[in-house]
Design a protein with these regions (language model features):
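A structural motif detector for short, solvent-exposed N-terminal "entry" segments of globular domains
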Residues: 47-80
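Electropositive
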Residues: 69-107
Length: 206
């Protein structure tokens, strides 16, 4: 009789263990599937957009799923193209947008060390180099993807503070005029900022 009760108890215990183990496994699998879905969704959103910056044309091209949807005039560096820190040159190669800065900041307001200064700058529409380098409206901070070329050591685009940003020298857009960054018209940089997510790739080429 005792032996039979033990068998019943052991069977019941085994059933309960299997039941709880099964539920735990199901919950774990569901969480894993959800995590994979979120990762793939994020990748899909980011991969949908890509940016090409042509130095020779002084234009930025925005693609969605390999289809051109926007084209903007820009200004790259007045000092030419190069990767080395303190050169003031525009780096070439593949980058990604590491950080977007300036959401809800008023148009023509400017930044100092990426901190918003709630004050509008005077926009220069003539082809005049004021020797100032106001960063206005929005910032998209670039991070190099080519190790040893535009990432790491003394050729790191992110540590060089290379941005896509608005400028007060709008009259010089379309010409090489920046100190290394990619400058845009303020209304253009506002639009681009809203269209693309962080992690969007940016290819800068001659």
């Amino acid at each position: 009789m005792i032996f039979q009760q033990n068998r019943i108890f052991n069977y019941s215990l085994a059933v309960n263990i299997c039941f709880y183990s099964s539920n735990y496994i199901k919950i774990y699998i569901m969480k894993l599937i959800l995590l994979i879905f979120l990762i793939l969704s994020s990748f899909s959103i980011n991969a949908a957009f890509s940016i090409e910056v042509s130095i020779s044309e002084q234009r930025l091209y925005l693609y969605e799923k390999n289809k051109l949807i926007r084209s903007y005039p820009v200004s790259s560096s007045a000092y030419g193209e190069g990767q080395v820190e303190n050169s003031l040159k525009t780096p070439l190669g593949m980058h990604k947008i590491k950080s977007k800065i300036g959401t809800n900041v008023d148009k023509y307001h400017f930044f100092v060390s990426r901190e918003h200064i709630p004050q509008k700058v005077d926009i220069i529409n003539e082809k005049i180099d004021t020797e100032d380098d106001f960063i206005t409206s929005r910032i998209m901070w670039l991070d190099g993807l080519n190790e040893g070329y535009n990432k790491g050591l003394n050729v790191d685009s992110f540590k060089r503070f290379i941005y896509i940003h608005g400028t007060h020298e709008e009259g010089l857009i379309g010409e090489k005029a920046s100190h290394g960054c990619i400058r845009m018209l303020n209304h253009d940089v506002l639009e681009l900022y809203e269209l693309i997510p962080e992690e969007t790739t940016v290819n800068i080429f001659l």
